[in-house]
A protein has these predicted regions:
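Short amphipathic alpha-helical patches
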Residues: 34-38, 163-164, 179-181, 192-194
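Surface-exposed binding/hinge segments that line
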Residues: 1-111
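A broadly conserved sequence feature marking short terminus-proximal activation segments
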Residues: 171-195
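Flexible domain-boundary/linker segments
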Residues: 24, 31, 40, 153, ...
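Generic alpha-helical secondary structure signal
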Residues: 5, 39-42, 115, 134, ...
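Hydrophobic (often cysteine-bearing) scaffold residues that line and stabilize catalytic clefts
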Residues: 3-6, 161, 192
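Phosphate/anion-contacting hairpin/loop surfaces
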Residues: 64-172, 180
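Residues that form generic nucleotide/phosphate-binding pockets
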Residues: 10-13, 17, 26, 43, ...
Length: 195
């Protein structure tokens, strides 16, 4: 599953290649959105992509008054290449195309408003890459009664951490994944913050 670092790389690449492109057409090619159509898809036509952004694993595409919410799920990605797993095709007036590919169809694509975005961003914890918590130890101590893995994987507490980052960080910090936060030394949590 793409985690914070991979999502950030996708977003950086999308901004580099497609920022300020204008949407000519958008088509659902396959997957779940054939049976359950995306609401208000036609509203995206002729919109200019102002920016691609992310917080943790959550991606949003800013189209001024509209926002596209996107998650990659287990196997999603954005590419110029159409594959048999391409779910959505976006064609631009700039003679280019962008495909949302998703082998397992766990990714999401929704059209929302700016107020929806504000609510969504408030519900997501601080981004592990660009906005780590100022006081990581105190943040974790709020969840003393919980298992360290459950807290790290909860995107509402700290966003962008998935299985491999959790495993590598805990190993580096010498923290048993079955530990409860209350049983951990401050030194372990400080090392975890740096991991």
């Amino acid at each position: 599953m793409p985690e914070g670092p991979e999502v950030k790389l996708f977003v950086d690449e999308l901004n580099h290649n497609f920022r300020y492109y204008q949407i000519k057409s958008i088509n659902v090619l396959s997957g779940r959105y054939i049976k359950n159509p995306i609401q208000n898809l036609s509203l995206l036509l002729n919109k200019e992509i102002e920016s691609f952004n992310c917080k943790g694993k959550f991606i949003w595409i800013d189209l001024d008054d509209l926002i596209i919410f996107n998650t990659l799920g287990m196997t999603g990605n954005w590419s110029r290449t159409k594959t048999k797993h391409s779910r959505i095709e976006i064609e631009f007036y700039e003679n280019d195309k962008l495909y949302f590919n998703d082998i397992r169809s766990f990714g999401t694509f929704q059209i929302k408003t700016r107020s929806d975005l504000e609510k969504k961003l408030k519900s997501i914890g601080p981004d592990m890459l660009s906005n780590p918590p100022n006081n990581f130890v105190n943040l974790l101590r709020k969840y003393n009664h919980k298992n360290i893995c459950c807290v790290l994987m909860n995107q509402n507490i700290v966003s962008g951490i998935g299985n491999y980052i959790k495993a590598e960080s805990l190993w580096y910090s010498r923290i048993n994944p079955y530990s409860f936060i209350k049983d951990l030394k401050v030194e372990n949590l400080i090392t975890l913050d740096k991991a």
